[in-house]
Structures are given as C-alpha cells and as structure tokens.
Amino acid sequence: MQRKKKGLSILLAGTVALGALAVLPVGEIQAKAAISQQTKGSSLANTVTAATAKQAATDTTAATTNQAIATQLAAKGIDYNKLNKVQQQDIYVDVIVQMSAAPASENGTLRTDYSSTAEIQQETNKVIAAQASVKAAVEQVTQQTAGESYGYVVNGFSTKVRVVDIPKLKQIAGVKTVTLAKVYYPTDAKANSMANVQAVWSNYKYKGEGTVVSVIDSGIDPTHKDMRLSDDKDVKLTKSDVEKFTDTAKHGRYFNSKVPYGFNYADNNDTITDDTVDEQHGMHVAGIIGANGTGDDPAKSVVGVAPEAQLLAMKVFTNSDTSATTGSATLVSAIEDSAKIGADVLNMSLGSDSGNQTLEDPELAAVQNANESGTAAVISAGNSGTSGSATEGVNKDYYGLQDNEMVGSPGTSRGATTVASAENTDVITQAVTITDGTGLQLGPETIQLSSHDFTGSFDQKKFYIVKDASGNLSKGALADYTADAKGKIAIVKRGEFSFDDKQKYAQAAGAAGLIIVNTDGTATPMTSIALTTTFPTFGLSSVTGQKLVDWVTAHPDDSLGVKITLAMLPNQKYTEDKMSDFTSYGPVSNLSFKPDITAPGGNIWSTQNNNGYTNMSGTSMASPFIAGSQALLKQALNNKNNPFYAYYKQLKGTALTDFLKTVEMNTAQPINDINYNNVIVSPRRQGAGLVDVKAAIDALEKNPSTVVAENGYPAVELKDFTSTDKTFKLTFTNRTTHELTYQMDSNTDTNAVYTSATDPNSGVLYDKKIDGAAIKAGSNITVPAGKTAQIEFTLSLPKSFDQQQFVEGFLNFKGSDGSRLNLPYMGFFGDWNDGKIVDSLNGITYSPAGGNFGTVPLLKNKNTGTQYYGGMVTDADGNKTVDDQAIAFSSDKNALYNEISMKYYLLRNISNVQVDILDGQGNKVTTLSSSTNRKKTYYNAHSQQYIYYNAPAWDGTYYDQRDGNIKTADDGSYTYRISGVPEGGDKRQVFDVPFKLDSKAPTVRHVALSAKTENGKTQYYLTAEAKDDLSGLDATKSVKTEINEVTNLDATFTDAGTTADGYTKIETPLSDEQAQALGNGDNSAELYLTDNASNATDQDASVQKPGSTSFDLIVNGGGIPDKISSTTTGYEANTQGGGTYTFSGTYPAAVDGTYTDAQGKKHDLNTTYDAATNSFTASMPVTNADYAAQVDLYADKAHTQLLKHFDTKVRLTAPTFTDLKFNNGSDQTSEATIKVTGTVSADTKTVNVGDTVAALDAQHHFSVDVPVNYGDNTIKVTATDEDGNTTTEQKTITSSYDPDMLKNSVTFDQGVTFGANEFNATSAKFYDPKTGIATITGKVKHPTTTLQVDGKQIPIKDDLTFSFTLDLGTLGQKPFGVVVGDTTQNKTFQEALTFILDAVAPTLSLDSSTDAPVYTNDPNFQITGTATDNAQYLSLSINGSSVASQYVDININSGKPGHMAIDQPVKLLEGKNVLTVAVTDSEDNTTTKNITVYYEPKKTLAAPTVTPSTTEPAKTVTLTANSAATGETVQYSADGGKTYQDVPAAGVTVTANGTFKFKSTDLYGNESPAVDYVVTNIKADDPAQLQAAKQELTNLIASAKTLSASGKYDDATTTALAAATQKAQTALDQTNASVDSLTGANRDLQTAINQLAAKLPADKKTSLLNQLQSVKAALGTDLGNQTDSSTGKTFTAALDDLVAQAQAGTQTDDQLQATLAKVLDAVLAKLAEGIKAATPAEVGNAKDAATGKTWYADIADTLTSGQASADASDKLAHLQALQSLKTKVAAAVEAAKTVGKGDGTTGTSDKGGGQGTPAPAPGDTGKDKGDEGSQPSSGGNIPTKPATTTSTTTDDTTDRNGQLTSGTSDKGGGQGTPAPAPGDIGKDKGDEGSQPSSGGNIPTNPATTTSTTTDDTTDRNGQLTSGKGALPKTGETTERPAFGFLGVIVVSLMGVLGLKRKQREE
C-alpha cells in the first residue's frame, strides 16, 4: 500500500509532464533530442519537461556535419563514405525544420503549473496550423511532402531534403534551424524500432488490447513471466468464453488471461508446452507477437509487437521424439478452431518449400475459410533462399534459372499475408570482453562458445601463444605446444586442422582453454563454427585476435579478465545485407505475387520456456512480427473514436482481412540493396517492403485510402507477356471526405523499372535498372471523395530488351494530402512455359564432387535392393559422367541390374505429371505414374539432402492386354519419359532418357595371353575377343580376371581393335601377383566380363605363357604358401582337431606326391587328375599344431621324377586363455561396466573384448572395462595370433543398471511404434477391420515402468507385457497421447501413438459389362464409369498403367467422400483384350474389375445369298438367306432399308410383290452391302392371297398393340407406332382392300415397329444393373432388410423391383435413376433416424472433434448433403459416410458406458470368463466381446460372419442364375455355406477363413468390389515400396453391412504427419 501511495504522489507531481507525454509522439521527443544534441552537444534527459525543452530550444548552434549525415544513412543501410561527391550532395536525408515562433509549451498559452491534455492538444494544433506557409515554401525546395509536425516542445516539422538543398531551407523566412534527424534507438527490441512499433504504442496507445492472436506452432509456456497482461479486465476471450468453446469442442482448456486457450492437436492432450530441449520455436514466436515483459535489461525481458494481445496456444507439433513435422489434418484442425474461437489473427511460422496455390490443398483451403470468417492469416515465406543456390539456401543462383521461387506452402495461400525476413539492426548474443584492469580492453565482440558451461573458464587465466617453427602464430599443431601451455588459455589461428582437432591438441597439451583467431583480416566475428562441447573454446575476429596476441606477447605473465555475457551488439549481417540471406524467393510458381511483405526476422531475441530467452533467425520470426502488427491494426479498426469506425465496422470476412493486408502493403517501405548502388531489393524477395506499423496505423486513423491492382491484390501481377508495351489498371479507393489527387514519385530510383541480374563473381542475385524502360499513367489520378477510380498504366520496355526475364519494381504515389501509397509490381517478359522442367543428364546441376548427380538413371538389384547410377563412366580427365548410350538393365534374374528408374532434378514445379515407358517405335509400354503435381528439386537444410523426384521403377515387364497376364518385354531399345506442364504454364514438356533392355550376355572367344615390354619390364595381358549386340560391352571397361587362382577383381580392359565380324579385341593387364603365378605350361585363365546391362560371361581357358614351349608343373595360387594356417585359402577344418589343406594345378600328365606330418613322417598325397584339362588336385591332412612340413610332387607313382619341392610351416595352434574371468565370475551386475580379465598364450597378437582392443602387458595379461546395458549382455572375447588363428570365449551377463529408466522402456509388438502407424484393411495384424478395434500389445523394460495411453492407465502383467485396445474406426488419423513413467523416479516423458488408416476399399462401377464379352470393330475403346471412396483421394490404373490420380495431400479426417468419374481411352489389339481397371485409395486399398473386349478391324462382309421358296406364281413366297461365313447374322428390310430385322429361321414370308433388302452382320458390327431381292411372282388379288394378306396384317396389328402396351419404348416411337397401327387398321377395314394396299400397310406398320426405341437401351441397362448391384452390396442384409415406411417394402425389395424394371426395360434410365435416388434418400433417412434414435442426448449433443459440430449435427449434415445430391453415386458415398458416422457414434456411446459392465443379453465370449457389453441397438453389428480377447457376440441383426473386404474376379464364377459354380478358398480347409438363393447377395463364408460365396442375380456374374495387390507397390511419391502380400485371389462378393465394416470413420486429427506427406515428397 505504501508503494501505491508513493506511486500516486509521483503521478500527481508529474502531471504536466505526463499530460504532455500523453499526446506527444515519440517523433517529437526524437526531434527535440536531435536539436539539443546537434546544437549543444547534450543528450535528451529521460524525463522531458517544459523547462528542459526550453533550455534545449534556446541553443541555436546547429551542427550539420558529415558525421551526422553518415550516422543517419548508416541506420538505413547506406555507407555514406562509399558515395561519390555528387551522390553525397544529391542524397536525401531526414531533417527537422524548426520554426522561429515559440512552441505551445513556451508561448504563454498554457499554464506552467497544470494544463489539461485537451488544452495542450488544442494549443499544439494552433502552433502546427501556423506552419502552413513555411511548409509550402519548404516543399517547393524539397519537392517532398512535409512529414510529421510538432507543436508542443518543438515548433517544427520533419521532411526529406537533398544535402545540397539544406542551405536553401535555412534562408526561408520563419525557419530558425534545419537539423539532421538523430538516429534514435529505444532500449526495447531493435526489431520493434525498425518497424516504428513504439511510435504506435506512444501515439495511439495501441498495444493489442482486445485482440486475440492464434499461435499455430510447437507450443507456449503460459507460465513465463512475460506471458502477462497489464490489465485482464477487458479481454476479448474470458474464461467463460473459453469454457463454452471447450464444452462444445471436447478438447482444449483455459490457462490464463494471456493464454486463454490451448490444445495439443498433435498429441491429443492439453500439454501445450514444447518439451524440446534445445529451443522452443513456438515460445519464441509467441514472444515476438505478444510478450509483455517488464524491466530495462533487454536480455532479461521481451516486449512483443502487441504486448497486450491474448495468445492462443495451438500446438501442432508433437512432443514425441519420433517426428519434427506436422500434417495436413492437424494444421487444418488448429486453423479451423482458431477461426471458431474468434481469433483476429492466426500465425503459422511453418511450411513446406515451393508450394502452389491450389485450394485442393487442405491447408490452403482452411486458410481461405479462416479469412472468410474474418480471421487474418499470417504465414512465413520460408528459409530456403532460391532453388538455384545449391546447398546454401541463400540469395544466389548458380544455375541461371528463370524460376527460382521457393516460397513455402501454406504461405502461398492467396489470402494470407506471407512474410519475408529482414535482418535486425542489433543482436543480443553471447559476447566476450577481455581486460587487464588497466590499459587493455578488447570487445565486447560476438563469439560462439563451445558450451554455455564454460562462461567462467577463461577468466583470470594466463594466456599462451602457440607458435610454429617459424615463430609465427601456429594453426594449432600438437607439436607446436610446449609444457608452458599447461593451465593457460592457448591462442592459435584458423586453418589446416579441423576445429575438433585444434581442441583435442590443446586439451592434450594441458591447456585450460582455447581461442582461435580468424584469418580473414576483418573485424567480422568468428561464429558458425563446429566446436565440440567438451573443451572451453571460442573464436575471435582477425582484428581483435591480433590485438590480443600483441598484448599477450608484450605481457606474457598477465592474467586477463575475460567476461562472457549476453550483450546487445550491432548485427554484422545487417551491414552486409538488410534482407536475411535465407529468406525464400517468390513468386508462386504460377507467377502470383509472393511474398507480400518483410519484417525483422534475422537475429531476433525472444522468449523460451521457464522464463528463458534466446536468439533465433528465420521467416518464422518475421511472420509473428506481422501477426502482432495486424493485431494492432485490428485494434485501431475497433476504436470507436476512430473517424472511420463506421466504415471499419461493416468490414467482414475476406473484405476485412484483405483490407488489413492492403493497408500494410500500401504503407510498407521498400528496402534498398546496399551492395549494389542502393537499387531496390527485388519484390520477389521483399514483397511490398519492410512493414511500417506507424505508417499503417496513421493511414487507418487519418486516410485509409488504398491502391490495388485490377484484380484487387495489393501488388500488380503482370504474369508473362511478350509485348514491349504492357498495359494494366490500378484501382484507387478514396475513403476520405475530400477529393484526392496522386502523383507518381519523381525519384527516378524509386520508380525505375528493374530486372534481375546475377553477380558473376558470387552468384548473388540483385536487381538492375532497365535503361529506357518506364511506367506512365494514362491520365491524371483524381479520386472523388468516397469513390474509386481505375487508372490505366503502360509499362514500356526498350525494343532491345531480351525476353525470358523478370520485370519488376515499385510504384509510389504521393497524395494531395501528403499521404503516400506503395505498390509493388512483377511480371515475366517472355513465355513462362519455356523454362525447362527437368535438368538434363550431366546438366547444369550435375556436380558429383558436391554429391549432386542431378538428373540421373538408377539401376537396382531386386535381390539386395542396392541401387547403382546407370551409364556412369569416367572420362579421360577422370570426371564422372553419364553416357546415355550405356544405360541398360537386364530381365535375367541373375544379372546385377534388374530395374530402371529415374531420379529427376526438377527445375520447376510441374503439374499433370506422367511417367511412361516407350518401346523403340515410340509406343507406350506402360505408364508408371500419373500425378497431379510434383515439386521442384531443392536442397533441404534440415535433412542435409536434395529433394529429388524419384520416379517409379520399371522391371522390364508389361501387361499383356491379350490375356491379362504380366509378361517380360522383349530385348530392345526403350525410352524412359517424363512429361508435365510447368505450373503457371499451359504447354506440356517432355524429357526422354534412352535405355536398353538386354537379357543376353556378351560372347567371348579366343582367350589368350600376350606380353609387351614396357619400361624395361615384361607386362603380361589376358586377351580376348568379345561382342555384345545390344547394350554393348561395359562402358566402364571393368573386368575380373583370374590366373592360376590368383584373382584381380579391379581390372580394366582396353580396346585393341575390331575383327571383321564385329568382335572387339580387348586387353587386360595382369597384376604382378598374377604374372608371378604364370608358369611354362597350361595356365588356367578366367575372364569375367559384363555388358552395360550387367549380363555376365564367365569364360575359362587354358593359356600358354607367351614365349614358352615347355609344359612344366604349375601350382595354382603361385604355389604352396610358406605358411598354412586357419586363414589360408584351401584349408578346411574338421571336427577331429585338425583339417585338410587342398591345392591344385596343371601338368600334361598325372601328378603324384608326398607330404610330411607333425612327426616328420612322410605320407602320400591324395591326388586326382583330369586329363581333359591337364589339371590335378591334391590334398593333405594337417593337425592343430605348429610344425614344418615338406611337399614333393612327382611325375610318377614311384616318386622318381621330382617335379617340385615345397617347404612350408603348418601354424594351426590357436591361442589359449588362462584364468579368463567375466565380472569376477558373477553372472549379474548392477554397475554400468564389468571387468573382463585374463591371460593369453605368448603367441597372441591381439585380444578383442567386444569392440575394444585390449592392451597386453609383458605377461600377456589383459584387463578391460566393458560397458553393459540393462538386461542380458553377451560378451565375446577373441584372441588372435600372428598366423590369424583365433579362439573365442563368451559369456552372458545380466545387468540391472539403467541410467535412464525411461529410455526405450516401452516397446510394441507387430510393428507398432511411437509416432505414425499407417495401414489399411489388410496390412496390420493388430487391427480388426470388422470392428475397427486395434489390439496393441507390447512389453515394458522394468517392473516399475508405468504406461498411460489416452489418459488411461494400462495394466502391466507380471511378465512385463501389456495389452490394450483402441477404437480406431475405419478411416482417419487418430492420435493417442502416451505418458511413460517409472515409480522409482519422479519424471515422465510424453510420446504419441498415431494411427492413420483406411479400412474400406473403394467402390468401382463400370458402364461396360464385366460379365459378358464386348465385341467391337472400333479400335478405340472408352472405359467409363465411377469410383467412390470414403476419403477424397483415388488413383486409377488401367492394364497396370497409372492413368489418373487426384490431389494426394488430403485431410483424411475431413469426412468428405471421394468421387472419380472414369473416362479413359484404350487402344484395342486385334482379337481378345482383357482390360483390367483398378482404383486405389490413399491407404492402398484397391478394387479391381476386368472387361473382356473382342476387337476385329472393320471390314465389309460378303453379301448373303437369298433363295425364294418358289419363282412360280404363288400366293406367298418364303425368302431364306444364308450368310457367306459362319458367325454372321442376316437381316432384311421391307421398307427400303430404313429398318432391318433378323431373318427368321423359317425365312421371310412375302404376301405381296415388292423389293426386299438383305445384308449380313456380325458381333463386331461389320456389315455386308445390302442386296435387293424383288418378288414379282405373287398372284394379285387371289382371294386366298388377299385373305392371307389380311390375316398377316391383322396379326401384325395385334403385335403392334402388344408392343405399344408393353411400356418398354419411348413416347415418340410409341406414338408413331399407334399412328401406323391406326392406319393399318383403316387399310384392313377397307371393303375394296387389295393385296398391294394391305402389303403396303403391313410394310409401314412393320417399319414403325422396327423404329421403336427402347426406354432402356442395352448399354444403359448393363450400367444400371452394375450400379444397382453396388448399391445392394453396400446396403447388405442389415440395412437392406429394413422397411421403407413410405412404401411398406424393404429396401432390398425396392432394389429388386428396380432390377426387375431394368430387366423388363419398362422405364427410362432417368426414371429408374430417379426412383433409385428416392430409395437411397429413404435409406439415408432411415439410417440417420436409426443412428439418432440409438444415440443418447448426452452423446448426440457432444462435439465430434473432427468437424467441430455435435454428433446430431453431423448426422443431419450428412443426411442433408446426401439427399441434396442429384447423383446416385454421390448418394452412395454419403451413405457410406453415414454408416461410418454410425460406427463412430456407437464408439462414442460405448465410451460413455462403464467399461466391462455391459448388460447385453447376447454378448458372449468364446474364450470364456468375459462379460459382454450391452447388446447393440437395432441395426447395430454385434460387437460386444468378453475380456481376454473374446470373440464378437452375436448381438445385433447383422450376420456374425460379415463378408471380407478383398477379392478379385478370377477364380469364382456364377452361372446365369447367379449361383456359385466354382468357389474356392485361399485359406483352405473351410467348408462354405450353401450358395444363396437367386437374388441374394452371397455373404456366408466357410470356417477357417474360407471365402464368401458369390451369388446374386444382379447381374449374372457379379463384379467384385476389391482386388488383390501385388508384392511390390509404389507410394504416392512414386517410390517402390515393399510388398504387403497378395490378397486372396478367389472371387468374393463383398457384403457391406450398415454397421459391419463400411464405415468411414472420421477421427480427430492431432497426429504427426510430416508436411513432406505433400512430398509423398519428396
């Protein structure tokens, strides 16, 4: 209380000062300070009073010096001293023009003791108003609008003026002084001052009050002392508000008034604090936005841009160590919740490089939705520089690319404000100051200390200069140290040795620490060096380091004070480049403008957990700066006293967010490039410029007028253009009450037109002016009050300006009221399509030395998985290069290369990407991949690797369309092709790489030896002739040779010419060892040679040594070695304590021999001889001992003809251990190490204890401390003697020592891991797709380990195993938080189990019949139909080729079903074609169907032969017709060819003379020419004939009436038939009817009959029946047997009626579709009604975390959306979604019940002992089970054996009645139940996994709904992945019960998916 009273008294005493400060802008304080300093040399006091101001104002000494100018320009990044004299005079500077008249505080109008704020403001305004005439005069001189005006302590104003014009200002009447504006830095974060944030705080009192900023990042520590509000009374989000939200959302909670809401979306819990040890990214971001620290030390508190704003902790990065990325669903959930809870701004300092702008991207769509709700989105641009900067990721282009963009997604979002990074002017960093207490002071200088633990390690130590042999400062060699270094700080210079080695040597010399002096000769601090953290070390700049060396040299015995602390120092990077070198370049790949704006992001000091702070750099730091600034802007809009409040209040949605963005961009300040003559920094790098928060707020308060491009964007996007004159329009909006006129800035630098250039020396990108280019307005810019004006501008380029360049710059407009508007523009002069999408082989990016091979083919060995660069050779200069003629692989399984793929270096983002294999004629063999888009290649700094596009591999097989089988392609030349459209373009580009498929090995002949004398030495060569007719001999010329068993695996051959028949003569030099092994006789030679496809020829031959004529004995391997040990080639041990030594050789006759044993006794060798090859083999037993032996070889058995004698030593005595002890004989230990001791025999050379080499003393004793891990440790000890013989002993030691009880303390079975677990219906054994339940088992490390999953404690069994279940449903990404602890320790760690699944296969409905063959004579066949899925991604393959896919980065939790319309052409082969159509969803569930098509080329058939029954006069004539070939059908026409019908088997009965046409047709649609047959022999008017004609017409009339009444034909033709019938009846009724008239009437009526058009054509019928089958299968028996109350029929019966109607053809397709839609609407309603009825209100009104709505709302929305759809397939997809929702709701209901207390009457347990949960509600699938893994109960009315979900159509068939005729079971042993009755959908299956029977009569051979998968598949990035095993191959008809397995479960996403899932890539 005393303190409060004291504060109150101070407030009262200082009311005058405070009153002044309440209205006094910071700018006026700065102005007064500048005047005071430059006129008197004194600084402004901390408290400004009228008295001190008066004292300063009376000092009239103005000091306008060069130093003052230089200081001001330096703050703007301009080096004044580098300007020439003309530039120094022409440059503009900021000055304060002080008036002669006194300011308000001195002119007597205010009381000196007290004046109110209102009085002060009133008098100040009068003073400012009186400045008008002087301002006008000043503006005439400066040509600049006057800036800020002052009137209280200073009477004056600021302006810009050229230096040369300053004296002119002083001459103007009324001007007292002209003073250079002082560079003013507050003690707060320098970044705030860069953007004029403090001025907003002071001038407008805006600090973010009443605003909320969402921080979508890695988390916030809400307990940090700077996470506070000064006053929490008037916050936007109260605790009550948050609790209302969380009650509905069912996640998240309230933390405090500063952080009112938070949730961990990644781990699905309320832990919002980032537990990353090194740095907390989200906490740093939060501090920049809204930290509210107190205190004067900038290192110990932080004040953010909007310190009074509230922050939402939307944690989207997991605390799990398994992932450092996040995924789409997680981000989307956080974005949506941010908007729902009412965030004004959301910040995302995250992204993936080089994004696009498609709203198919779920994050971009979510950002758009947030904008539409009025939440502004601010996103970082990325930290990757340009794509042309190789591994550096900076502002460079080494490749000369036209497309260098790297702006990341979701920062590419159109509505987001995307932020680039500028460097901070100063940096708080670790700095060193070195003093001696008297004359020395070095620093403070920025350093990088090896560890924070060593801050005191250098203080008060003596220093030691390490000198080299020349007496100069050493580079730190160990030999340069002396004993004097001990205990001192060593000083060395940079170079030669690694930093690590320098540290090691200093430590080894006994030094106490190390200082490394840089060698670049500058004062640049030495940071960013790789130091180990175990030895005290830092670096110094060259300048400071040399001063230290000089001082120590003069004072070697001084102990120096070394203070290492945090300090604010100038940022060296700011002096090199105002922009951060890492900030990502724009534009978006479609030439849309990005980034939007720049903010400080380089070297920013901000908050960390636990009241900590740190320095970080990145656009991640720039983005929150803008987010905070937009909170201030939003506060200004909410200010009811703002004169424009009424306008602002009506801004909603995107109108609001776009306005905020536009105002900030219009008021931004473009940054100049200090390294290139102060030209502009490219708008593609800085956007609109550096944010000026004060200017933006000024605009909102005074004149919120704006200028935008014609499309409404606050930047002009010229796109690409080719005309040198480009017109565009700008829209000016005047929101004031007075007319405004605008003039373009007259500054030629500002308004110049620029293009991009590259510094040839450094590769740095910069902008340069385009000489002769200009932009001019088409008219004066006048904007009436409250109106808009659209003005046309023309950009003119010189005719000489080359195309394929960017054109860019800034348009600056000065308003008539002094306001300014800034607008960047950017376009591409040329054709954006033209830039290459792929780098070529050996292209611009190819740099093997740097590890970048650019675009390169990859060859793979299937067996090992090893990949090789294809065609890689070494040129004459030793450089690696790709020879495109040497790229080949083999279809031979024994070859090394079995597959080919391409690793592409994509130079651009591309869309509609397709990868094909073409044959030698350019025909497509297969399509390996089709994808919507692929990202360009770039270097990822985090993973330290290039992100290429790895296209799928081809293994040389193809789909044989003739029979549907996979075949091996023929050998030959092929092409690997990629094609795509550059994003933003419209022209497809193609890039081809030729290769060969070659399965035949080269042929080799005439293997021989040759010799040459080279340098006085005989060099032997192995020669041969070789030939390969396709891929060619190995281009690397690698070969393997063996001479007499001496091998050279690294040989190479040279070409020595070519034979007449095309063989290449090759020579391979022998190695010295091989040459020594040669003898005068039969030398065995082996040549192993491959072709480029890796087919190998291994050729053996006997060769004669050149020049030799004798055939001596040759022993292979160069003879018997001097020593035979266990490592000798040819020795083989046996089990009797010895072994056998075997050797071989050649001799022209049999060889015999003897050897001596260990006792010296002689024995015969065991020899064999092969006369055909003159080769022998001999063997001798040897014993485990050391002894000398002799071997003699003879030419005879009598041993009289000695051929060769060998002396050798047998060395097989292994070393021995004596007194070997492990852990002193104990099997257990509780220590971290155990001791292994023992003694070895004297001949032992080495002893290895595990990986440690033991030291042996003189007595051969050893002792080793061996580290052990918790659990069983097998310790191996191996002794090795000099001969290589070894002895090994081992023992298992069990250790209870565990330094980290929690490390690896939990392991899971069946492949489950912490982090993401992705699977489908068949790939995970732990998951049951029928129930959606996952059973997770595993083991803990300790009995004391505790495990909590999803907030529930998991019981641990005595054997340390555990088991628990999770309800995963059938679709979605579901994270479960995991907490692992130990009862003996007071600590835990967090992890996450995330499951990403889709357990439902897609549906596939084809319009063509899949049951009966299709015949056609058109080679172009169209496959049409529809595929649906429960998620939004589908890919389509036809005949094994990937032909279509949808946007792969989906939000799997969106609940939106997928839909794909299929319309794909296929080129038919003549004869039979089996077309396989497969659709695959996001988790590789696949459904496959086959269409069999027979095609014959169109041809003209031979005309049929027509034969009359008689040619004599007759009453009737019967015409029969025969086709010329079998399989043809003859048709006839009685109406002149208008209509045709089949000739009846009995022929055509003719009753009247006339002409009849006949033609032949076949199944393929071919026809013959029509032949006419004229009947003339009918007797006219014969009574009998007349009666016959009447009868025939009567019959035909009756038939016509029957047809009319059938209802099968459309109205038009039925009406025509009725008219023809009436006409025929009239003719029949005529009394004078003749045969001719009756015949004519008959003919006309027959024509009308023939012209009847069926209501349901055959193709429509087939398609509809297929569709009805899919619907019926989807309903299953459960839902199908329910009754539609409106009809009283079951849904199955209703579908059966539709089938009958379709079969009957009595309704049109549209009518049937309408009826089907009604049935589906009724099904949807019934299902929704059932779900809602079975859902208690407390659950139904609860929130579905995935959608944010209640379960009841989800049900209603899905029902409404489904019923609103007009398409039956869409309704089916919604039905699936509703069924999924039912599963999820049921799970929620079950979760609300007490576990294990079910009261179900039918739940049973097959294993016994378990009490089932309650019986399901009507319509539910029995799902209850007892404990201990009981089987599903039989509760519910769905069959207890629901059908499986995978099948093909190959093995099971059905007869025409739908009966199963040949069902089989892959699992075997199971007896299937009887086939279902006709019309039923077969669902029963045999025991032990038998397949479901097929059945059902819709159609006769029901198509399957899922399919098999192959062993190898490709992922979404085209990568070959390991196969998951083939699915069952028997035919299955899949039943989909309503609650059985068709659900599309939509789970909340808090999981961990890397944004690289977009890089499915990447």
UniProtKB/Swiss-Prot annotation:
InterPro entries: C5a/SBT2-like_Fn3, C5a_Peptidase, Ig-like_fold, LPXTG_anchor, PA_dom_sf, PA_domain, Peptidase_S8/S53_dom, Peptidase_S8/S53_dom_sf. Gene3D superfamilies: 2.60.40.4070, 3.50.30.30, Immunoglobulins, Peptidase S8/S53 domain, Subtilisin-like superfamily. One of its GO terms (biological process) is proteolysis. GO terms for cellular component: extracellular region; membrane. Residues 1-33 form the signal peptide. Residues 34-187, 1931-1962 form a propeptide. GO terms for molecular function: serine-type endopeptidase activity. It is an enzyme of class 3 (hydrolase). Residues 191-697 form the Peptidase S8 domain. Residues 1856-1865, 1890-1903 have a biased composition (Polar residues). It is a peptidoglycan-anchor. The keyword Secreted applies. Coiled coil: none annotated. It is found in: Secreted, Cell wall. A motif (LPXTG sorting signal) lies at residues 1927-1931. The modification Pentaglycyl murein peptidoglycan amidated threonine is found at T1930. Residues 1797-1812 have a biased composition (Gly residues). The keyword Ribosomal protein does not apply. Its EC number is 3.4.21.96. The active site is at D217 (charge relay system), H281 (charge relay system), S620 (charge relay system). Keywords: Cell wall, Hydrolase, Peptidoglycan-anchor, Plasmid, Protease, Repeat, Secreted, Serine protease, Signal, Zymogen. This is PIII-type proteinase. It comes from Lactococcus lactis subsp. cremoris (strain SK11).
